[in-house]
Amino acid sequence: AKAIELFDAIESVDSAALATRLDRLVGERGTRTGGPLPVYLQVNVDADPAKAGFTPDELERELAGVLALPNLEVAGLMTVGFFTGGGEAARPTFARLRELSERLRAADDRLGAGLSMGMTDDFEVAIEEGSTLVRVGRALFGERPAPA
């Protein structure tokens, strides 16, 4: 609930249930300055058990319902590449998300064109594959401190 007050967008909506909950919370708090809350739907295009997100099949089944939520604007899709192997290892993941986005947007133009993919170790490849938003915190702020 606090996130909808603190953030301009949420990039990790990994289920229709979470989208529905966010929509309800935004609605309960009244109209947001600037309109609906922009969200990116997290897609696990690799079926990696270590990652959260819609599978491509789940997204296809549930997208229309999420797009119909009045207090959310689906700005695009988000994914995380493989954690090992560097940028080239993540290229197929990024290409699959771009292709999925193109196909889904051809069927329903309410889905935003944003592609949030790429982090510090693979953002160059993500941009080559069409990323419109990269997450490069470690490149800007350095490594996270080890837990105490």
Question: Which residues does each predicted region cover?
Answer:
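Conserved alpha/beta-domain cores
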Residues: A1-F123, I127-E129, R138-E143
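Active-site loop ensemble at the mouth of alpha/beta enzyme cores that anchors a bound cofactor
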Residues: A146-A148
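Divalent-metal-activated hydrolytic enzyme cores
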Residues: T132-L133
